[in-house]
C-alpha cells in the first residue's frame, strides 16, 4: 500500500517519517520522564510539577483564610434565627414544626398562633399599623402567644437637665 501524502494527519498512532518507519516516543514537557507526582495535602489531586502543586495549595490557603474570616464574623454576631431563644416573629406560622416542643413525647405540642386565627386579619392589608406579633420559643406566661397591652403606662417623657 502506498504511503499517504505528507499533508495527511495520523490521529490514531504515532507519527511516521518517510526516511524510517520507526516509532518515536512522545515526551511531553507536562509529563516528565521521571513520572514523579506531587500530591496535594488538602485534596486528592496530584501534580507533575512542584510549581503547579504550590499554586494549587495557595488556592487552598486563600479558601481557608476566607473561611476563618467568615467564622469570625459569624461568631461575633448575635444569632439570627435561634429557636431556643424567644424572639418576635412578624410573619405567620402556618405549620407546626415537629421538632419544636416537648422532647418527652408525652406532652402534646402547643399550637402556635397564626395570622389566620387572629381577629381582624385582612388578607388585602396584611400589615396593620399595630401589628400582632407571634412569639416563639419558651413562653412561660401561660398566654396565647400574642402580645397584648393590659393598661396604658404612665411614662414621663419630658426631658430635664
UniProtKB/Swiss-Prot annotation:
GO biological process: cell differentiation; floral meristem determinacy; negative regulation of abscisic acid-activated signaling pathway; regulation of DNA-templated transcription; regulation of flower development
Chain residue ranges for the region called Disordered: 1-33, 142-161
Localization in the cell: Nucleus
MF-aspect GO terms: DNA binding; DNA-binding transcription factor activity; transcription cis-regulatory region binding; zinc ion binding
Alphabetical list of InterPro entries matching this protein: ZFP3-like (IPR044246), Znf_C2H2_sf (IPR036236), Znf_C2H2_type (IPR013087)
Chief location: nucleus
Zinc finger (C2H2-type): 38-60
Tissue: First expressed in developing carpel primordia, and later in stamens and ovules of flower buds.
Chain span(s) of sequence motif EAR-like (transcriptional repression): 155-159
Keywords per UniProt: Developmental protein, Differentiation, Flowering, Metal-binding, Nucleus, Repressor, Transcription, Transcription regulation, Zinc, Zinc-finger
Database matches in SUPFAM superfamilies: beta-beta-alpha zinc fingers (SSF57667)
GO-annotated cellular components: nucleus
Free-text note regarding domains: Contains a slightly degenerated ERF-associated amphiphilic repression (EAR) motif, which may be involved in the activity of transcriptional repression.
Job description of the protein: May function as a transcriptional repressor of cellular proliferation that regulates floral determinacy and relative size of basal pattern elements along the proximo-distal axis of the developing gynoecium.
Annotated protein name in UniProt: Zinc finger protein KNUCKLES
Name of the gene: KNU
